[in-house]
């Protein structure tokens, strides 16, 4: 390792590899952490093999997500045997959820940090280098990492977290336990970030929040509808997306702004979880099946051609076959463009874990999930097939995995498109004629 001078103190430079699991917020957090560490003289590497320090930025939303982390830590044990000086840190939602128990769940962890404590990472890493294990799980009522310029991982699309945490208490969800209560960034700081990204040539900006519609800057009397409108005006010509919305919070005024601003993408992710009002009540979702239908009708009447995606859970506590059929019938009626689909797994500490019996056998959960996946695959296939022959505008994001002669990108409605390169590069906006489709992808050629 090389030596540098930092703050008049001689330090050894360390190469850091961060592996990010889970959601877009975790990806945005990794960019913030990278900036914090680079400011302290650490050097980032894209290879675990070249790293002196490996940080796992983790997700706890489902049981299998935690199992992935534990499997990775087991893999790291072998690395440490051959490289005794290697440090390993686990940060994010898993250590925040399990706290000090995490040290006993896997060997060889040098430090643990929750999502509100990333400013403490340089000190924790320095202690770990001296053989001192550390953990910090403090929640903050105001930490939004405002003022830190993230080390962006790309040059085309960028994330801006505008709020953190969640005040909803859905019965199945760990987010309030791992991300804390809602707090929002000042709207002026968001607009400053947007301005910098637009001036730097970014083509797409996604506003992030665990419950983004709850954004509120009380001092500026600015809610999410106002923020989204101001962002769209400040970054005219840049695609604007946002996620994730709660059905009970999405408003007619917000939908009108999306319809009015050409650069706000016509794609809304609106998790419903179940099509049964009884299950929605058990889940503490705050709305009924009928109210969700009303939201969908309002959105589609205001925004022609909008795509709507969702999240669905199979086999939640007490779910009957009738409840499951209600989910399938909702899917048939709404015809989601795509969906994230899972079967229920108990998360300790949640209301469901404490008060509701996990009484649907795992095999039955899997069977119901298979039905949901099959139906959504059919619906997605039909909706994509309807695009064949159309000319759509695609923001090229990267070279296609299929061939170096093809690019991959997305429409403003968030449909994935693979198309013949024809001299175009990532970052270009390309008019593409759709020739064929699959349930997941549109295939075309420049028009």
From Swiss-Prot:
Subcellular location: Cytoplasm
Record-annotated TRAM domain positions: 385-447
Predominant subcellular localization, coarse grouping: cytoplasm
SMART domains the UniProt entry points to: Elp3 (SM00729)
GO cellular component: cytosol
Binding of [4Fe-4S] cluster 2, residues: 166, 170, 173
InterPro entries xrefs: Elp3/MiaA/NifB-like_rSAM, Methylthiotransferase, Methylthiotransferase_CS, Methylthiotransferase_N, Methylthiotransferase_N_sf, MiaB_methiolase, rSAM, rSAM_horseshoe
Start and end residues of each MTTase N-terminal domain: 14-130
Positions in coiled-coil regions: none
Free-text cofactor note: Binds 2 [4Fe-4S] clusters. One cluster is coordinated with 3 cysteines and an exchangeable S-adenosyl-L-methionine.
Membership in a protein family: Belongs to the methylthiotransferase family. MiaB subfamily.
Complex formation: Monomer.
The name this protein goes by in its record: tRNA-2-methylthio-N(6)-dimethylallyladenosine synthase
Gene name for this UniProt entry: miaB
């Amino acid at each position: 390792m090389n030596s540098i001078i930092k703050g008049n103190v001689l330090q050894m430079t360390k190469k850091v590899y961060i592996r990010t699991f889970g959601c877009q917020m975790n990806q945005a957090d990794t960019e913030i952490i990278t900036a914090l560490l680079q400011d302290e003289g650490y050097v980032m590497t894209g290879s675990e093999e070249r790293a002196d320090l490996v940080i796992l930025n983790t997700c706890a939303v489902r049981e299998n997500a935690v199992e992935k982390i534990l499997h990775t830590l087991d893999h790291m044990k072998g690395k440490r045997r051959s490289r005794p000086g290697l440090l390993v840190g686990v940060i994010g939602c898993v250590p925040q959820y399990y706290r000090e128990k995490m040290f006993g769940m896997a060997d060889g962890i040098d430090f643990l940090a929750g999502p509100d404590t990333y400013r403490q990472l340089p000190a924790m890493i320095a202690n770990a280098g001296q053989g001192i294990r550390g953990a910090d799980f403090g929640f903050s009522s105001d930490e939004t990492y405002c003022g830190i310029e993230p080390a962006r991982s790309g040059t085309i699309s960028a994330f801006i977290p505008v709020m953190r945490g969640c005040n909803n208490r859905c019965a199945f969800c760990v987010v309030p336990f791992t991300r804390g209560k809602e707090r929002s960034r000042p709207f002026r700081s968001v607009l400053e970030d947007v301005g910098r990204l637009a001036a730097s040539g970014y083509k797409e900006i996604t506003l992030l929040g665990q419950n983004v519609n709850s954004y509120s800057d009380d001092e500026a009397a600015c809610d999410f509808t106002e923020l989204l409108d101001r962002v769209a005006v400040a970054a005219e010509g840049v695609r604007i997306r946002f996620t994730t919305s709660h059905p009970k919070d999405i408003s007619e005024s917000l939908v009108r702004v999306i319809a009015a601003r050409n650069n706000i993408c016509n794609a809304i992710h609106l998790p419903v979880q179940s099509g049964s009002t009884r299950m929605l009540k058990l889940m503490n979702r705050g709305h009924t099946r009928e109210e969700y239908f009303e939201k969908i009708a309002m959105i589609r009447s205001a925004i022609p051609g909008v795509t709507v995606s969702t999240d669905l859970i199979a086999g939640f506590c007490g779910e009957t076959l009738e409840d499951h059929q209600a989910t399938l019938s909702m899917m048939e009626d709404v015809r989601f463009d795509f969906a994230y689909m899972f079967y229920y797994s108990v998360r300790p500490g949640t209301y469901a874990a404490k008060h509701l019996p996990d009484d649907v056998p795992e095999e039955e959960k899997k069977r119901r999930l298979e039905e949901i996946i099959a139906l959504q695959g059919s619906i997605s296939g039909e909706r994509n097939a309807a695009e064949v022959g159309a000319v759509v505008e695609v923001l090229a994001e990267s070279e296609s995995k299929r061939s170096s002669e093809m690019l991959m990108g997305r429409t403003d409605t968030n449909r994935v498109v693979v198309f013949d390169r024809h001299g175009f590069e990532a970052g270009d906006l390309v008019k593409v004629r759709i020739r064929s489709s699959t349930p997941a992808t549109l295939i075309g050629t420049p028009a």
